[in-house]
Amino acid sequence: MQQINFYRQRVAINVLAKDIANAKAIYEAAEGHAVIGVLSAQFATVEEGVPEVKRWMAEVPSISVGLGAGDPAQYYKAAMIAAHTHPAHVNQTFTGSGFAAGALAATGGEQTHINALVSPTGTPGEVVISTGVSSSQGTPARVSCEAAVRMMQDMGAHAAKFFPMGGEKSLPELYALATTAARHGMTLIEPTGGISLDNFGIILQTCLEAGVPRVMPHVYSSIIDPQTGNTRPEDIIRLMEIVKALV
């Protein structure tokens, strides 16, 4: 069965891979504490995505079905691919997370972790929840972190994904969201956007200090070799060294 293997039950990293060989190398470098993203944006249809995701799942024990740069248009494909494959994790917009939870429940996929994407406002304690296909085109819906977390729980999401963070730019906001998540029994937070080897430590530390039980930072382009397109296993090893130093 697919599952997220958190280091000391606290931290896993969500990363991309060029292909299955790269995914296996990364997973090994992370000592099993990595979740490998497969993006829905690359598939024209759900039917095209399902066999490919199954192929990855057969080789890697922890697969995350992604949107692709938080693209809200991918919410349906991501949810339905996940419902047909039951990966360890699926990424969702805030508004799409309930749909994904329903699709997974209907197919016996309750073990799949679902996140709900909220965005920074510039004000700690408030987030934007209008991250869906239509809502992202209209007036931004700013709500308190508490309202956002409680609504995620109502919809069946397990985690708050905070994107785009812009690296350290949104640290006070991340801390506010993480403390709120912890206070209301949400067990996972996923900081995303502009995370690199240089700021990974401070971002992870911020979440851990907030008291949220589990953290899964998404680290993408900063650890991908632009020449080969491969995520660098040596960078994964360095990320894990930071994790071990902080947990």
Curated annotation (Swiss-Prot):
Disruption phenotype: Cells lacking this gene are able to grow with D-glucosaminate as the sole carbon source, although the growth rate is significantly lower. It catalyses: 2-dehydro-3-deoxy-6-phospho-D-gluconate = D-glyceraldehyde 3-phosphate + pyruvate. GO terms for molecular function: 2-dehydro-3-deoxy-phosphogluconate aldolase activity. Induction: By D-glucosaminate and DgaR. It is an enzyme of class 4 (lyase). Signal peptide: none annotated. Keywords: Lyase. Its EC number is 4.1.2.14. Belongs to the DagF family. This is 2-dehydro-3-deoxy-phosphogluconate aldolase. The gene is dgaF.
